[in-house]
């Protein structure tokens, strides 16, 4: 830890400059939360009630193991997260990583996020070493493979490389069972086909978690959380406009769920900043709460609506 702190500080300051050790000098991997704080982060997430229940089940098992030292080395803790983009898969993966580290199941508070292109090479014989290097870099923590189904999709040669990647992963998941957790993530149907075509993977995955799309009310709550987290507020009229935009946008086939909400909040903030700039020409004007109040004029319907590729039929 000492060496990591010094390296972190040396990268920011001149060699002879006298500096004071500050919290930001501590590498992220060492900024460890206690378990109650981690569980609060989990429970504060909007929706995901079934996921929270399943994570709590895992916590109960790991806490029992810590108290009794039962033998769980042969348990399968590799996971599969299925659901549309923006439904919280990566966020929950980060929280699970913190939990596993806090309870001593993994050695490092480290989540390594990759996709198929990080695992598969373009030439014969190079995929296995490339996959091995990625797994090796993730040892001691959690390896999160997003859009994992794309490992085995594509033209014949690509599929061949994908099979090599899967074979390597299977061996390493077994060999390093006590040093690595792998989480495969992706769309529901694509992940089902991916697992069905690889029986070896299915047998090594101990948990499958389904992340459902957020309801309109949950999406609106995520938006409000972003507003309040930034010490801002929003008028009822503006909030109603946001709700209407979310309702229409959510009918698109490739709607981004929570990710879309973060994007529209950013766009609304930009519009709000422009409007404040227009009416606040005097830089010395007295600061008022109105500056942090989002109103209907900040909600630009054309910029915020998401049409997507097509629209879902209501009620089907």
Protein language model regions, located:
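Canonical AAA+ ATPase core
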Residues: 149-156, 166-212, 229-230
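Conserved C-terminal "switch" segment of AAA+ ATPases
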Residues: 103-108, 190-196, 202, 211-255, ...
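Flexible beta-alpha connector loops of hexameric P-loop NTPases
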Residues: 116-127, 150-163, 208-210
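The conserved phosphate-sensing helix
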Residues: 1, 49, 250-277
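Short glycine-rich substrate-engagement loop in P-loop NTPases that contacts/grips substrate
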Residues: 108-138
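Pre-Walker A (pre-P-loop) alpha-helix and adjacent loop at the N terminus of AAA/AAA+ ATPase modules
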Residues: 34-79, 98
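Walker A/P-loop
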Residues: 74-109, 133-136, 205
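C-terminal engagement/docking regions of AAA+ P-loop ATPases
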Residues: 33, 273-316
């Amino acid at each position: 830890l000492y060496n990591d702190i010094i390296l972190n500080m040396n990268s920011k300051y001149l060699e002879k400059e006298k500096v004071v050790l500050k919290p930001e000098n501590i590498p992220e991997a060492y900024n460890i939360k206690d378990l109650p704080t981690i569980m609060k982060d989990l429970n504060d997430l909007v929706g995901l009630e079934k996921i929270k229940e399943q994570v709590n089940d895992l916590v109960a098992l790991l806490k029992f193991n810590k108290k009794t030292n039962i033998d769980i080395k042969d348990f399968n803790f590799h996971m599969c997260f299925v659901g549309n983009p923006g439904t919280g898969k990566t966020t929950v993966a980060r929280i699970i990583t913190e939990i596993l580290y806090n309870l001593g199941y993994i050695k490092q508070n480290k989540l390594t996020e990759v996709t198929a292109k990080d695992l598969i090479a373009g030439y014969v014989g190079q995929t296995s070493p490339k996959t091995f290097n990625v797994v090796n870099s993730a040892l001691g923590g959690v390896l999160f493979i997003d859009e994992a189904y794309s490992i085995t999709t594509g033209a014949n040669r690509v599929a061949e490389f994908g099979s090599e990647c899967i074979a390597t992963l299977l061996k390493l998941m077994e060999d390093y069972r006590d040093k690595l957790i792998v989480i495969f993530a992706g769309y529901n149907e694509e992940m089902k086909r991916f697992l069905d075509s690889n029986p070896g993977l299915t047998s090594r995955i101990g948990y499958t978690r389904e992340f459902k799309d957020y309801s309109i009310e949950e999406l609106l709550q995520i938006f409000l959380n972003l507003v309040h987290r930034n010490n801002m507020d929003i008028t009822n009229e503006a909030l109603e406009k946001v709700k209407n935009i979310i309702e229409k946008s959510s009918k698109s086939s490739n709607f981004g769920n929570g990710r879309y909400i973060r994007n529209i909040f950013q766009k609304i903030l930009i519009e709000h900043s422009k409007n404040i700039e227009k009416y606040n020409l005097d830089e010395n004007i007295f600061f008022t709460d109105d500056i942090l109040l989002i109103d209907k004029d900040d909600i630009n319907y054309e910029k915020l609506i998401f049409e997507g590729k097509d629209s879902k039929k209501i009620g089907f």
